[in-house]
Amino acid sequence: MTAKEIYFAGGCFWGTEHYFKQVAGVLETQVGYANGKADCRPTYKEVCTDQTGFAETVRVVFDADVTDVKFLTRMFFHAIDPLSVNRQGHDEGTQYRTGVYYADATLRPAIQSVFQEVENTLGQTLAVELLPLRNFFPAEDYHQDYLDKNPQGYCHLPLELFRWAREQKP
């Protein structure tokens, strides 16, 4: 097994985390706050002020022997509106912006190729960040695995998308 990680900001992290937990080859997920202005751990309340620059983000650890970052990035694009700025579903604010953040620069070319595919298909410039990971702080415990603990909890993603994600093969 070869474990690698990638970070996806896809709006509210509750739904994005639950979505990626359905995907083949994903070993672990963790919700948190990424690429903000500070190097100290923010609270959810602080992130919601739009003053910290952090995005609600999901750290995805995957088995590179089972799947790859191109497949995961394509899956990500199925779960977001890539043209929307600072908004996904009913959630609005800079913390809900979309982005793909990488700690391993060797992943960038594969991710960039998927961005180009999507941009060519849509014929428009994407509103999705593609940046190196500057920082990531795990969110509070009550946010981790939120939809597993609260199956009737709020989610901006449709339930059918989770079923669809389980059916996809790398």
Predicted feature descriptions by range:
Residues 1-170:
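Flexible coil/turn and secondary-structure edge motifs
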